[in-house]
């Protein structure tokens, strides 16, 4: 799939399947639908939507961090839990339940992971540049 310009006046206006594409929201105001590939080196924001069934679908065995921006994690259907890695030795993980129709804003630079309560639809928005994964110990 090649990038589909959403704001190009010569391109027909049509729906974008959010579960088959990622939306790239560029800093210059352009929006593009493209292959659902996480762009760690791109500019701007990336909107990602997923059908997920197991914790493996959300790499639940890894911590994730986004140093360039906050991340909005929304549960569209089902239910998820966000876990935040302790910032100090000896502290417990912080757990936040996210019901269908709600979202959490993950602070910039805060290590986090997702666990599912069951099959769910999730939407995420962040600046992916510099994002990292780290296997849970």
Predicted segments, located by residue:
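A short, N-terminal "cap"/entry segment at the start of jelly-roll beta-barrel domains
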Residues: 1-62
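Double-stranded beta-helix
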Residues: 3-21, 57, 113-137
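Short, charged/polar surface micro-motifs in flexible loops or helix N-caps
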Residues: 43-45, 52-58, 77-81, 88, ...
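Short, surface-exposed beta-edge/turn micro-motifs
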Residues: 45, 69-72, 120
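Tight coil/turn sites that cap or link beta-strands
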Residues: 55-57, 100-101, 107-109, 119
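His/acidic/aromatic-lined binding-pocket segments of jelly-roll/cupin-type domains
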Residues: 64-65, 70-75, 96, 104, ...
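Short, conserved beta-strand element in jelly-roll/cupin
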Residues: 66-82, 86, 125
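Short acidic-glycine-tyrosine-enriched beta hairpin
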Residues: 87-108
């Amino acid at each position: 799939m090649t990038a589909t310009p959403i704001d190009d006046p010569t391109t027909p206006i049509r729906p974008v399947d959010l579960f088959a594409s990622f939306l790239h929201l560029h800093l210059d105001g352009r929006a593009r639908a493209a292959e659902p590939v996480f762009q760690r080196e791109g500019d701007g924001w990336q909107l990602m939507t997923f059908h997920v069934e197991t914790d493996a679908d959300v790499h639940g065995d890894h911590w994730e961090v986004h140093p360039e921006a906050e991340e909005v994690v929304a549960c569209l259907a089902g239910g998820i839990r966000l876990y935040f890695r302790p910032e100090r030795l000896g502290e417990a993980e912080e757990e936040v339940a996210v019901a269908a129709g709600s979202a959490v804003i993950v602070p910039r630079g805060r290590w986090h992971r997702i666990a599912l309560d069951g099959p769910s639809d999730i939407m995420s928005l962040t600046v992916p540049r510099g994002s990292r994964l780290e296997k849970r110990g």
